[in-house]
Amino acid sequence: MNNRVHQGHFARKRFGQNFLNDHFVIDSIVSAIHPQPGQAVVEIGPGLGALTAPVGERMDRFTVIELDRDLAARLETHPTLKDKLTIIQQDAMTIDFAALAEQAGQPLRVFGNLPYNISTPLMFHLFSYTQSIRDMHFMLQKEVVNRLVAGPNSKAFGRLSVMAQYYCQVIPVLEVPPEAFKPAPKVDSAVVRLVPHTEIPYPVSDIRVLSRITTEAFNQRRKTLRNSLGNLFTPDVLAELGIDATSRAENVSVEQYCRLANWLSEHPAKQE
């Protein structure tokens, strides 16, 4: 028996498809999302509808984004869902979520069992729309959730941690074993809730500068800041900003990275 076939659909590796089929896990996720009629709910990657169907029981209307044309076609003819769904057959990485929120007249509630092969770039795409998003609930590879929630001075703390926590409060919800899926992935999974900050705790004047600094620091995470960011900051500037030049990327807090970004924005000549 081919374990990549579920409900008559062959799971496509190129789309990173693993279908959730554990009812306890499904109920736990839907309870965590707690969708309500009238809310602007958007599901990314509904697949065979494991989450779509129970969410649909609570909603009059909601939107799903599905790249796989075969799965989108199945949803279009689904007996209980077809009249409730607005189906966008498109890559979520190309979606303008601000436009969706504007059409809905309210911030979006986004959820999904995200394909693990695109989860990190999709997160960065969504972070750019947090002003249009009320909250997000995602099933992700457990290692990615660990990175999202990690604090400074831990190996899991990285660029994703800094950028996620800059935009959102990050809350782990539950862990999910491989056997909850078909086909079973080779890794553990977890559900995370991301709630965009009403006010950014440590605002930066140019997010691109924060992105550049974190990229350069974490691309050379074993080096001290004196070396990894030496082209941008002298040891004296780091000291002036309250940051030890002998520390490494993982030892610097979100607030300190924002401090670095704002200093660099005020001294544009240093960016050249």
Curated annotation (Swiss-Prot):
Gene3D superfamilies: Ribosomal RNA adenine dimethylase-like, domain 2, Vaccinia Virus protein VP39. InterPro entries: KsgA/Erm, rRNA_Ade_diMease-like_C, rRNA_Ade_Mease_Trfase_CS, rRNA_Ade_methylase_Trfase_N, rRNA_adenine_dimethylase, SAM-dependent_MTases_sf. The keyword Lipid biosynthesis does not apply. Keywords: Cytoplasm, Methyltransferase, RNA-binding, rRNA processing, S-adenosyl-L-methionine, Transferase. The keyword Cytoplasm applies. GO terms for cellular component: cytosol. It is found in: Cytoplasm. One of its GO terms (molecular function) is 16S rRNA (adenine(1518)-N(6)/adenine(1519)-N(6))-dimethyltransferase activity. Its EC number is 2.1.1.182. It comes from the Bacteria. S-adenosyl-L-methionine binds at residues 18, 20, 45, 66, 91, 113. It is an enzyme of class 2 (transferase). Specifically dimethylates two adjacent adenosines (A1518 and A1519) in the loop of a conserved hairpin near the 3'-end of 16S rRNA in the 30S particle. May play a critical role in biogenesis of 30S subunits. This is Ribosomal RNA small subunit methyltransferase A. It comes from Pectobacterium carotovorum subsp. carotovorum (strain PC1). The gene is rsmA.
